[in-house]
């Protein structure tokens, strides 16, 4: 195994978690998405940021912090001015840290265009891919993305109108909220929505099969925008650093515990990368719903994927989290090392409902079902002297019926969402059979 921790970080070279594919450049890793051996790309080494960066982090803006982090990841491959522009364009919105209760803060990741944390990765990746395509003079790159809800809207809106790129969003029929669906089925232009007769796992399988199909790849230039793509998940590290900066400003930076509602594991992986770069986080908590594959792994040391089950925290309904391979790789496959830095929790729909209801009643803070898992895990697991931050990954209005049903009150819908709701849905039906999907793509 090649060590992930080296004195120099240069993502110019990425290797695959399966260790069978040749080492790739950043550009190849971003354009291809998945390695030839079906593994996920990992940076060759991770460079800690200097101590003076952490000493002065509370004086820097979100964009300044993000640029320093992006430079450590991508700086050797992208000219400084271009990278700065990509970062500043991506972060056109704030990610405030809001106090909910004693020693527990919400990192609100829902102030972007589609009101979900994936706006950060989606916008960054769209701009980075756009840059590489222009640089190569390429035409017509096709982005395939499977979504259980928020990824589709964030990626579609991130890429909307980006020249030379067409996005195909695959989503499970009837398993995505109307608000989520409207955010990627009403856009038109270079975005096509495919309504798959199956589950999210079926959608993800179609995307992965397409990448592995030789004939398709000879016919079309394909890439992925799921968190399997390094350009999607690495930028998510930005807001962990910014959360720390805000804690520091509040005089609460010691013994920080970060809790991440976890589905496909891209989000927590980005946080773990931050820790490897020296970010002073004491420990992480991965909060699962009933799809508690990771929680079971922590308990038993065995990774046993299983079909996902539907819950009210639908973005976390993942039965075989892709990024688990990255977590394993980051810790050299050691269950003991993983357990030392990450603990897990698992909650039922009933417990999630209870948490949303009580937090609204006691603190007048409205959680979405995913954030509720994060908040509850901190309520249950924070130790004396620790400060907890949970990631509030999407605006509660994106889960309108669920949230209104729980609190028994109307939830105000942000103007951005109201705009989407006015649009007309346009999608193409698709079977979960790869042969049909392939036929469709070959006809493009």
What positions do the PLM features span?
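Well-ordered mid-protein domain cores that form the structural environment of catalytic cofactors
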Residues: 106-161
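Single conserved hydrophobic/aromatic residue that forms the stacking wall/gate
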Residues: 1-11
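Short glycine/serine/threonine-rich phosphate/pyrophosphate-binding segments
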Residues: 119, 125, 144-157, 177-178, ...
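Active-site/ligand-binding loops adjacent to catalytic centers
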Residues: 180-228, 232, 285-373, 406-444
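Glycine-rich, mobile lid/loop segments that gate access to catalytic sites or pores
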Residues: 142-178, 183-184, 190
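Small-residue-rich anion-binding loops in enzyme active sites
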Residues: 39-115, 187-217
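A glycine- and small-aliphatic-rich helix-loop capping segment at beta-alpha/alpha-beta transitions
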Residues: 123-134, 158-168, 185-187, 275-281, ...
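Domain-scale recognition of functional cores that engage charged ligands
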Residues: 205, 209, 218-275, 279
